């Protein structure tokens, strides 16, 4: 990333290691002609904000693509926010994300970048947590109301990543009951594409994980970029490809149905999102994410041990459960090393089919 001449935090690159950074920065110099309908700083009339890549783009500043933050001051109704760079800090370790799930680790490095809107005094801290052992970066945003009036937040993304070359296929995991996690691959087109949930839960309709695949990517080779929400509520993973083929990707809280009133001196943290890159195809990505979950998400004594085995009665019995049958299933399972038998559906009320007795939480003694 880089601090631009406009004072904003610019996104430069994410991917394989670079060997010649100066040449890369030279090639990134803006060249597109400014248009009269686009916002650009008076000092750089050839540099339109619509074409720059940003770490935290906001609404109403000349960047007409999807925004990472929309906040409205209650006293003026102003919903424009121009986040100027203030300071940054690099530290070892990380702080807890209160009330939300987050990744942990012994060798974590954290970059915190502070920006502020000069007019509303809204302060935005962008957090980048580097898990170098698995090539994963987790990100979230903290919003602090430094002004003297309440602010209404209606849009708050955990991360934004802009790609100069947005030629990708999108892989998502979709489905429903009994056919969850069905891979779906589709090419990205100009305009907005969204995977998300408005159910109050992440849901099995659309899993809160996506991957972007290059044209030559397969199971064992090619670039893959993944975005995984560490969040079980309503979410969005959305992309916008512009007329020049550049792509913006964002992940965060689902804006539909979301609104947060932030009083002066209060803070609001967005959920964490995990970003992972691999040049070893989908299999390489899976390996990195598997290691990330095992080493940095799982908690407690079983994180690195073989877990106890259990058998759930659903697939074996469905609703047809009774004492004699359960004993036979349990005895057979025990012979194979199973340590726990879980009685699933069919034990309560007149629960003999899926259309009866939900809520009748009393034991069916006849079974």
Show the residue positions of the predicted features.
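Aromatic-lined carbohydrate-binding/catalytic grooves of carbohydrate-active enzymes
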Residues: 302-367
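Polysaccharide-binding surfaces and accessory modules of carbohydrate-active proteins
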Residues: 7-241, 256
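Short Pro-Gly-centered flexible turn/kink motifs
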Residues: 82-85, 260-279
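Terminal connector regions
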Residues: 131, 276-308
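Flexible loop residues that form catalytic
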Residues: 146, 273, 346
């Amino acid at each position: 990333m880089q601090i631009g001449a406009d004072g904003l935090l610019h996104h430069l690159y994410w991917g394989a290691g670079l060997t010649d950074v100066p040449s890369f920065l030279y090639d990134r110099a803006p060249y597109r002609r400014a248009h009269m309908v686009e916002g650009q700083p008076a000092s750089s009339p050839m540099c339109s904000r619509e074409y720059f890549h940003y770490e935290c783009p906001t609404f109403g500043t000349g960047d007409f693509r999807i925004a990472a933050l929309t906040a409205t001051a209650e006293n003026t109704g102003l919903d424009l926010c121009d986040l100027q760079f203030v300071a940054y800090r690099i530290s070892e370790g990380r702080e807890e994300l209160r009330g939300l799930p987050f990744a942990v680790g012994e060798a974590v490095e954290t970059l915190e970048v502070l920006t502020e809107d000069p007019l509303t005094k809204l302060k935005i801290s962008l957090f980048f947590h580097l898990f170098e052992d698995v090539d994963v970066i987790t990100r979230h945003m903290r919003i602090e109301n430094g002004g003297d009036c309440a602010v209404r937040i209606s849009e708050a993304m955990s991360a934004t990543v802009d790609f100069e070359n947005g030629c990708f296929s999108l892989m998502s995991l979709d489905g429903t009951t009994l056919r969850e996690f069905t891979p779906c691959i589709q090419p990205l087109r100009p305009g907005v594409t969204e995977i998300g949930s408005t159910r109050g839960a992440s849901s099995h309709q659309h899993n809160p994980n996506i991957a972007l695949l290059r044209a030559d990517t397969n199971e064992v080779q090619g670039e893959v970029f993944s975005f995984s929400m560490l969040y079980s509520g309503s979410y969005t993973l959305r992309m916008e490809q512009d007329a020049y083929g550049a792509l913006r990707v964002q992940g965060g809280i689902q804006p539909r149905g979301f609104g947060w009133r932030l009083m002066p001196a209060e803070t609001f943290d967005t959920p964490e999102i995990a970003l992972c890159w691999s040049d070893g195809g989908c299999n390489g990505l899976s390996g990195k994410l598997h290691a990330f979950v095992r080493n940095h998400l799982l908690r407690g004594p079983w994180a690195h041990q073989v877990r106890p085995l259990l058998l759930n009665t659903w697939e074996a019995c469905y609703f047809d459960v009774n004492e004699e049958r359960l004993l036979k299933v349990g005895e057979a399972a025990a012979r194979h090393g199973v340590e726990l038998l879980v009685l699933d559906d069919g034990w309560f009320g007149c629960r003999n089919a899926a259309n009866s007795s939900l809520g009748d939480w009393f034991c069916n003694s006849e079974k």
